[in-house]
Curated annotation (Swiss-Prot):
Residues that bind Zn(2+) 2: C126, C129, H156, C159
Lineage, highest ranks first: Eukaryota, Viridiplantae, Streptophyta, Embryophyta, Tracheophyta
EC numbers for this chain: 2.4.2.30, 2.4.2.-
Gene3D superfamilies: 1.10.20.130, 2.20.25.630, 3.90.228.10, BRCT domain, Poly(ADP-ribose) polymerase, regulatory domain, Zinc finger, PARP-type
Homology family: Belongs to the ARTD/PARP family.
Record's catalysed reaction(s): NAD(+) + (ADP-D-ribosyl)n-acceptor = nicotinamide + (ADP-D-ribosyl)n+1-acceptor + H(+); L-aspartyl-[protein] + NAD(+) = 4-O-(ADP-D-ribosyl)-L-aspartyl-[protein] + nicotinamide; L-glutamyl-[protein] + NAD(+) = 5-O-(ADP-D-ribosyl)-L-glutamyl-[protein] + nicotinamide
Renumbered residue ranges of the record's region Zinc ribbon: 301-345
Biased composition (Polar residues): 379-388
Induction info: By ionising radiation (IR)-induced DNA damage.
Ranges of compositional bias, category Basic and acidic residues: 215-226
Name of the protein this chain belongs to: Poly [ADP-ribose] polymerase 1
GO MF terms held by the record: DNA binding; NAD binding; NAD+ poly-ADP-ribosyltransferase activity; NAD+-protein-aspartate ADP-ribosyltransferase activity; NAD+-protein-glutamate ADP-ribosyltransferase activity; nucleotidyltransferase activity; zinc ion binding
Length: 983
């Protein structure tokens, strides 16, 4: 995911267009300004609220840490010091106007708070030696208490003990969590440093005595304190006193700015661009940006191209960063403190007559100095508005700091309450002040009172898997990946006219329609997801024409997926020709491609940093009048009517889409096209390759994972896109796409538009599958009931099954495809298959299918095939029912197994070996064969109770049967089953 933005940005104004949010006056060009970074409500991105720096530095409690300020390294040294002294003092009343006033007395009087921990990242830098603190190393932090003093100072434990040798490690917060081996290594360091510490303490005592600032007794008391006096002399910016490196950095910064001032005085913008071109540097940016790039190159040498994407680097946020794209889907993530530079001198254009440049060129040295930079501490910042301070973030990984409330019924809450308390976290019966997050169980109503209260109090609302992952990793995790945003506004039902739907936000849906001109339908939904920047945007573009007249409107709606509070919309009235011209202009601007290339599916190419159109097919080809389909009379049997209502219930599909976190606002009832799903599978296949193959370059692997994840979430818009980087997450996305395939079929076959005139009978006919209820006293019903009741596996204890209805099936054309295998192969069995309710319209219409070629080859123990079981509960697991929705559907299929290839452990294959027609995974528990029955003469029904098999070395608990040809399967019965969940 994108790194959280820093709360503040510091820079010199690039123009005189901004005004100060504090004093309301204009911020003149090149004036020092500070911007508070906030999420824009107008677009999907971050925007600065600019202020004069002097206005901010007069206030208290604004900037909590130097590391909270983006761009501080690019300021003049004097302005950098203003911010540092503001943070050190904790009050900004005098720092804005004085650069030389010492604030050490304030810092010295501040009480310090200390802690010790094992570093969870490699992002922090030691304030003493300026080296990185690597992941797994023990580090010590200090933090002054009091208003405004919220900056953390990190040190290697060894470096800290060299400065403060009398530290009682056992008294530090977090000492008990340090591994014994690390404790044993640290304790001798205290003992070794004690003699030197006594000398330093004596010197400090003598100095303080001469200065008259401390009495002798105070020094004695300090020896008994937890930390030596020397540690109190540290400034919040992290240094005991100006070191040689700090002085070098100051001198270098001043020299660099002298050069920038000369460039401003003597060199024009055009000459700066020419100079950058000659040196193969980027020429993009404002006059200030050009000046910065030229000064950097003149002083330190021209920058080489990015090693990952061959893009241009520039200095930003304390690092040299690449601003190019690793592919059309993703920005390049390369950044470094020590970039490669082109060998040789900085070049001056041959034709230049600029005397300053000519004079400078004669004096330039062939060997350039190296730029001195501070270690980047981007991971150790407070996150500004709505977040905890830096101290809290340093300890946020402890489960003891997690305070959880649960949304759901009492039975769902009780098990979680016990687990939360056992893990050491705190359970809150209701959301209140101090609650860290509200965890949503199951399908809790988004209008739930606790959820409304949590939103009012700005408490994070997260999914159950947040707690699962916290307990697994034994620490409090960030909420971002698990958040459930308010999607109540996103449940959009569309009003379809013609071949498309007018967006309801336009307010024109009642008396207008989408403009159609021949094969052209002027309606598109654009998507862009980039995990490296945090962008997850949509853009809707439509030409809307009045039903009675020729007037047209160009409608635009934009924002962030899953968040209706961010974005906006616009409706402009114009003539038809002007509307078409404006539509095409906007499409080209947003996608980098012409409308014709997309319409004709020729030469369309995704462009870096641009949107991608999504295929949305509303599944309707004619205009219809509004009617309630379920209220009309039907010729179907009552039990079949209830089944059809289950299959065609829009809320079932809506709930599935919500479970998958699909953006339902801009994908009305998730009508993704087959093309999008196919492209989603292709992205997952690439992710699978990256996860399974060893890569010697972790940075490149991470960038490629970001790129493939961007492709996936652009094709399949999600409320919470993230980097897919582990096997479980990957498999869940594969299952999601498999389910979406059937939702796509259901939407295309049945349609979910509210104005449909189709009755249940009409929808039933479109399934092309004859479905007949079985009488409960029939022989087939009793056999199936016995099969269900006797084959429940002993380990599946979470629920029991109750048979409600059985329907005989006859899919159109299926018997003819199956007949040759029925006669030729033999060895036929009646076997179980379970699936989500949302998959059954697709199954009844098209039969059981094998995963497509573009789907990743994972999650399939024995390859891509159709899987069956002889124990009912083995298949029932895949119905994914719950207490609120306890009724599921299951299949009994006649399967022509032929010669079986038997295995005791997983082995991927595209098809069984020569001479074999199916695969069987041998389980440790099997149905008792003496109780098997025959159906229709030669079809085996393995309806015996589970017993131990003779196979002892198998990795499988229960039998699995796999065929690799759909023609070997004939659907026979559909079962309506009630799951009686026990918890």
């Amino acid at each position: 995911m994108a790194s959280p933005h820093k709360p503040w940005r510091a820079e010199y104004a690039k123009s005189s267009r901004s005004s100060c949010k504090t004093c309301k006056s204009v911020i003149n060009k090149e004036n020092f300004r500070l911007g508070k970074l906030v999420q824009s409500t107008h677009f999907d991105g971050i925007m600065p609220m600019w202020n004069h720096a002097s206005c901010i530095l007069k206030k208290t409690k604004q900037i909590k840490s130097v590391d909270d300020v983006e761009g501080i390294e690019s300021l003049r040294w004097e302005d950098q010091q203003k911010i540092r002294k503001y943070v050190e003092s904790g009050a900004g009343s005098n720092t804005s106007t004085s650069t030389g006033t010492s604030t050490s007395s304030t810092a010295n009087n501040a009480k310090l708070e200390y802690g010790i921990e094992v570093s969870q990242t490699s992002r922090a830098g030691c304030r003493k030696c300026s080296e990185k603190i690597l992941k797994g190393e023990v580090r010590i932090f200090s933090k002054p208490e009091g208003p405004g003093n919220k900056g953390l100072m990190w040190h290697h434990a060894k470096c800290f003990l060299e400065m403060s040798s009398s530290t009682e490690l056992e008294s530090l917060s977090g000492w008990r969590s340090i591994p014994d081996s690390d404790q044993e290594a640290l304790l001798p360091l205290v003992k070794k440093a004690l003699p030197a510490a006594k000398t330093e303490t004596a010197e400090a005592r003598q100095t303080n005595s001469r200065a008259g600032t401390k009495r002798k007794n105070d020094s004695v008391d300090n020896e008994k304190s937890k930390l030596a006096k020397s540690s109190f002399d540290m400034s919040t910016s992290g240094a005991l006193q100006p070191c040689s490196k700090e002085k070098e950095m100051e001198a270098q910064t001043k020299e660099l700015w002298d050069l920038k001032d000369d460039l401003k005085k003597y060199v024009t913008s055009a000459e700066l661009r020419e100079m950058l071109e000659v040196n193969e540097q980027s020429t993009r940016g404002s006059e200030l940006d050009l000046r910065d790039k030229c000064a950097d190159g003149m002083m330190f040498g021209p920058l080489a191209l990015c090693p990952m994407c061959s893009g241009h680097l520039s200095f930003s946020g304390g690092l040299y960063r690449c601003h190019g794209y690793i592919s059309e889907w993703s920005k390049c993530s390369h950044s470094t403190l020590d970039p490669d530079r082109i060998k040789g001198k900085w070049k001056i254009p041959d034709e230049t007559e600029n005397q300053f440049l000519l004079k400078w060129n004669k004096s330039q040295k062939s060997v350039k100095p190296k730029r001195i930079l501070r270690p980047v501490l981007s991971g150790e910042t407070s996150q500004g508005q709505g977040s905890k301070d830096a101290t809290d973030s340093s300890r946020s990984e402890r489960l003891a700091d997690l305070k959880v409330s649960i949304a759901g019924n009492t039975k769902e809450r009780q098990p979680w309450k016990k687990r939360i308390e056992e893990a050491g976290a705190e359970f809150h019966a209701n959301v209140k002040k101090g609650t860290s997050c509200l965890v949503v169980c199951g399908l809790t109503d988004i209008r739930d009172a606790e959820m409304r209260k949590a939103r009012r109090m700005k408490v994070a609302i997260v999914r159950e898997d947040y707690l699962v992952d916290c307990f697994k990793k034994q620490r409090k995790l960030p909420f971002d990946k698990y958040k459930i945003e308010d999607t109540s506004e996103s449940l959009v039902t569309v009003k379809v006219k013609g071949r498309s739907a007018v967006h309801e936000a336009s307010g024109l849906q009642e008396h207008c329609h989408i403009l159609e001109d021949g094969n052209s339908i002027y309606n598109t939904t654009l998507s862009m997801s980039d995990l490296s920047t945090g962008i997850n945007s949509y853009y809707i573009l439509q030409i809307i024409q009045e039903d009675k007249g020729s007037d047209c409107y160009v409608f635009r709606k934009w924002g962030r997926v899953g968040n209706e509070k961010i974005g906006g919309n616009k409706v402009e009235e114009m003539s038809k020709s002007d509307a078409v011209h404006e539509f095409k202009r906007l499409f080209l601007e947003k996608t980098g491609n012409t409308w014709e290339s997309w319409e004709q599916k020729t030469n369309f190419q995704k462009q870096p940093g641009k949107f991608l159109p999504l295929d949305i097919d509303y599944g309707v080809n004619k205009q219809v009048a509004k009617k309630e389909p379920f209220q009309t009379s039907s010729n179907l049997a009552p039990s079949l009517i209830e089944l059809m209502k289950m299959l065609f219930d829009v809320e079932t599909y809506r709930s599935a889409m919500m479970e998958f976190e699909i953006n339902m606002s801009e994908m009305p009832l998730g009508k993704l096209s087959k093309h999008n799903i196919q492209k989603g599978f292709e992205a997952l296949t690439e992710i699978q390759r990256l996860l399974t193959e060893s890569d010697p370059q972790p940075t490149m692997k991470e960038s490629l994972l970001v790129d493939a994840s961007n492709r996936f979430f652009t094709m399949i818009p999600s409320i919470h896109p993230h980097i897919i980087r582990d096997e479980d997450d990957f498999k869940s996305k594969v299952k999601m796409l498999e389910a979406l395939q059937d939702i796509e079929i259901a939407s295309r076959i049945v349609g979910f538009d509210v104005d449909s005139t189709e009755s249940l009978d009409d929808k039933y006919k479109k399934l092309h599958c004859d479905i007949s209820p079985l009488p409960h006293d029939s022989e087939d019903y009793r056999l199936i009931e016995k099969y269900l009741n006797t084959t429940h596996a002993p380990t599946h204890t979470e629920w029991s099954l109750e048979l409600e209805e059985v329907f005989a099936l006859e899919r159109e054309g299926e018997f003819d495809k199956y007949a040759p295998h029925r006669e030729k192969l033999g060895n036929k069995m009646l076997l179980w298959h379970g699936s989500r309710l949302t998959n059954f319209v697709g199954i009844l219409n098209q039969g059981l299918r094998i995963a497509p070629p573009e789907a990743p080859a994972t999650g399939y123990m024995f390859g891509k095939g159709i899987y069956f079981a002889d124990l009912v509960s083995k298949s029932a697991q895949y119905c994914y029912t719950c207490k609120k929705n306890p009724v599921g559907l299951m299949l009994l299929s006649e399967v022509a197994l032929g010669e079986i290839h038997e295995l005791t452990k997983a082995k991927y294959m595209d098809k069984p070996p020569r001479g074999k027609h199916s695969t069987k995974g041998l389980g440790k528990k099997v149905p008792q064969d003496s109780e098997f029955a025959k159906w229709r003469g030669d079809v085996t029904v393995p309806c015996g109770k589970p017993v131990s098999s003779k196979v002892k070395a198998s990795e499988l608990m229960y039998n699995e049967y796999i065929v690799y040809d759909t023609a070997q399967v004939k659907l026979q019965f559909l079962l309506k089953v009630r799951f009686k969940h026990k918890r």
